[in-house]
Swiss-Prot record:
This is Vacuolar calcium ion transporter. Residues 1-30, 83-91, 147-160, 227-252, 311-319, 372-380 are cytoplasmic. It is found in: Vacuole membrane. Belongs to the Ca(2+):cation antiporter (CaCA) (TC 2.A.19) family. One of its GO terms (biological process) is calcium ion transport. The modification N-acetylmethionine is found at residue 1. One of its GO terms (cellular component) is fungal-type vacuole membrane. The gene is VCX1. The lineage of its organism: Eukaryota, Fungi, Dikarya, Ascomycota, Saccharomycotina.
Length: 411
């Protein structure tokens, strides 16, 4: 043996690591990262409770409550996994992933509700998502972002462009409702309902085409207009995350994405399945549950993110989340659900009531007015929040369809 030859080689001095142990360690680390990624994850304790109560058909009210609370953190985990996957997929594919899975919870809940024949819940939840984003989220952003500042400024042109597109989208959604409101009620209601169904399906196809063109505008032809907002998103989200230096692998993101989607589907099934019992036991109308309660499930994570971003004085990003979510609902989720109803032979229409139409018009008008000057303060947030509370109170006392039909028959 040569004198310079080491007694132990480097390979022998460090035993090879077991790949299985390394994989398990990485999986545990990813799980810890996901569990700490959102301040809402403490609600995960309700996931097993909701599944157990739903599987064994225990108290309907508790089943609804537990699954309602369970879906909130699951939606946050789903959004986190989608964002991680989008970051590694590039701008175009990543944007499409965010556009598709950004409203996954609303889609899952709505599809299950449609399959169970809960058309009224689906219609109300679509409208409720728009109202909560335009009034509740916007108001909270203005309040928490401006409580210690004289005023906050944001890109007036970008905000107005998004708001104008939202106004057009909401106007197109209201055309079938206006069509129905101008026609007399009587023996020909069945014939008129058929025409409204056909109009809703045609309108939905047009809106979805506009949505595809909007995605091309945002991700393709005018991508430069949104680059600054994307950079701000990465910067702010890295500061919000409790471990900004860690990121999920593509495999981990896919596993979490698929696993969370499956769990949300079970929770949503139990949630929707108990709505009728909750209506009977609490006296709440289906419209109120769909309009006020259900939208919180899918939007709570985005609401928290918007407020945290606004508190860091990133109002362009906060408005982008609030108005962008509204655009997703108006241009994609709502017309898509009409087509899903068409495929499964459920008459899902865009026929909102006159009162619902009025509230949506008020929400769009007020949100456009508040961002008109490119400045905001906490008092404007109070105005927006107060309007949302007034609308919620009105729908709390607004009778459901059965009550209205019985009143109409008695007259």
């Amino acid at each position: 043996m040569d004198a310079t030859t080491p007694l132990l080689t480097v390979a022998n001095s460090h035993p090879a690591r077991n790949p299985k142990h390394t994989a398990w360690r990485a999986a545990v680390y990813d799980l810890q990262y996901i569990l700490k990624a959102s301040p809402l994850n403490f609600l995960l304790v309700f996931v097993p409770l909701g599944l157990i109560w739903g599987h064994f058909q225990l108290s309907h009210t508790l089943t609804f409550l537990f699954n309602f609370l369970a879906i909130i953190p699951l939606a946050a985990i789903l959004a986190n996994a989608t964002e991680e996957l989008a970051d590694k997929a590039g701008n175009t594919i990543g944007g499409l992933l965010n556009a598709t899975f950004g409203n996954a919870v609303e889609l899952i809940v709505s599809i299950i509700a449609l399959k169970k024949g809960q058309v009224r819940i689906v219609q109300a939840s679509m409208l409720g998502s728009l109202l909560s984003n335009l009034l509740l989220v916007l108001g909270l952003c203005f309040i928490f972002g401006g409580y210690n500042r004289v005023q906050q400024t944001f890109n007036q042109t970008a905000a107005q462009t998004m708001s104008s597109l939202l106004a057009i989208a909401c106007a197109s959604l209201l055309i079938p409702a206006a069509f129905r409101a101008t026609l007399p009620h009587g023996k020909e209601d069945h014939f008129i309902d058929g025409k409204i169904l056909e109009l809703s399906r045609g309108t939905s196809i047009v809106i979805l085409i506009v949505y595809v063109l909007f995605l091309y505008f945002q991700l393709g032809s005018h991508h430069a207009l949104f680059e600054q907002q994307e950079e701000e998103t990465d910067e702010v989200m890295s500061t919000i995350s409790r471990n900004p230096h860690h990121s999920l692998s593509v495999k981990s993101s896919l596993v979490i994405l698929l696993g969370t989607t499956v769990i949300i589907s079970f929770c949503a099934d139990f949630l929707v399945g108990t709505i009728d019992n909750v209506v009977e036991s609490t006296g709440l109308s289906k419209t109120f549950i769909g309009l006020i309660v259900i939208p919180i499930v899918g939007n709570a994570a985005e609401h928290v993110t918007s407020v945290l971003v606004a508190m860091k004085d990133k109002m362009d990003l906060a408005l982008g989340v609030a108005i962008g979510s509204s655009l997703q609902v108006a241009l994609f989720v709502t017309p898509f659900m009409v087509l899903v109803g068409w495929m499964i032979d459920v008459p899902m229409t865009l026929n909102f009531s006159t009162f619902e139409t009025a509230t949506l018009f008020i929400a769009v008008f007020l949100s456009n007015y508040l961002i008109l000057d490119g400045e905001s303060n906490w008092l404007e947030g109070v105005m927006s929040l107060a309007m949302y509370i007034l609308i919620a109170m009105a729908f709390f006392y607004y009778p459901d369809e059965k009550t209205l039909d019985s009143i109409g028959n008695s007259l």
